[in-house]
A protein has these predicted regions:
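Conserved small/polar residues in nucleotide/adenosyl-binding loops
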Residues: 147-154
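Sec-dependent bacterial lipoprotein signal peptides
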Residues: 1-6
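A structural "domain/chain start" motif
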Residues: 7-49, 53, 60, 65, ...
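Surface-exposed short loop/turn segments
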Residues: 57-59, 69-114, 118, 122-137
Length: 154
């Protein structure tokens, strides 16, 4: 399991409302699936575990397997490569990896806060590196975007 050391400021804010711990006690995070045209078989399970880890470590919510007061689920919908910095010999010296995750957030206590939204992050890396060497950073960025997102603004 990857230890996720986020650099983002966690605000626990979804759709304009902070978590009310007097009403919301539990969260269910369903396994994210990989629906991208290109599939890295380890990415979805790792993303799910990293997301669970953040909630366990940085909220007072109890993680439960089903019927949580809050529920997160979704799928990886994009895992895309693009050549960057093409050299004179027509070989790219850098590659851009973009990961997109669609997330559905449900609040059983306050359904007005429910939303579905896609989050993306990309990183350029030297073409001699493996994509897995930047995946962790991209997943961390997407998790930070999810936390700090105010879906009402989108």
């Amino acid at each position: 399991m990857t230890v996720l050391a986020t650099a983002c400021s966690i605000s626990y804010k979804f759709n304009g409302a902070s978590i009310d711990y007097t009403k919301v006690k539990t969260i269910t995070i369903r396994d994210f699936t990989n629906q991208a045209p290109y599939v890295n078989p380890t990415l979805a399970p790792q993303f799910t575990e990293d997301l669970k880890d953040i909630y366990i470590r940085q909220t007072r919510l109890q993680l439960v397997p089903s019927n949580g007061d809050l529920e997160l689920e979704g799928e990886i919908t994009g895992y895309d490569f693009a050549p960057m910095a093409v050299k004179e010999d027509a070989i790219a010296s850098q590659t851009r990896l973009t990961i997109t995750v669609r997330v559905r957030y449900s609040n059983r206590v306050n359904p007005d806060e429910d939303f579905e939204q896609s989050f993306s992050a990309y990183r350029e890396f030297d073409s001699n590196l493996m994509p897995q060497q930047v995946e962790g950073t991209l997943c961390e960025e997407i998790i930070c975007l999810l936390y700090t997102s105010d879906a009402a603004d989108d």
